Amino acid sequence: VAGAVWSLACEGAAVGGLDLALTSDVPVGSGLSSSAAVECATVLAARDLFGGPSDPARLALLAQRAENEVVGVPCGIMDQMASMVCTAGHVLLLDTRSLAAARRSRAACSWWR
């Protein structure tokens, strides 16, 4: 959580103090990208309070930076991008090099039954 706020501050946001409470049904360490989801939720909450970028890809990069540089996990960007841009009932098409992302609805995916 602190790493996500630090990452936003590194982006130039005038971050101040905050009290933050997180709740989740996702078990920690379950392999369901819970750390990426927490980082993204924290970046969004801090951004809403203190300002910062609005581009979802930029916000995902800030969350990834927290995981890489503060937590010490050399993760890629996929989990953070999924947390930032996915919507229920859709599949995410993501180019992790360019961060180009597109969503397709279940109805548009003939293979998704």
Q: For each predicted feature, which ranges?
A:
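Anion-binding (especially nucleotide phosphate/pyrophosphate-binding) glycine-rich loop
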Residues: 1-62
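ATP-dependent small-molecule kinase catalytic core of the GHMP/sugar-kinase superfamily
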Residues: 51-113
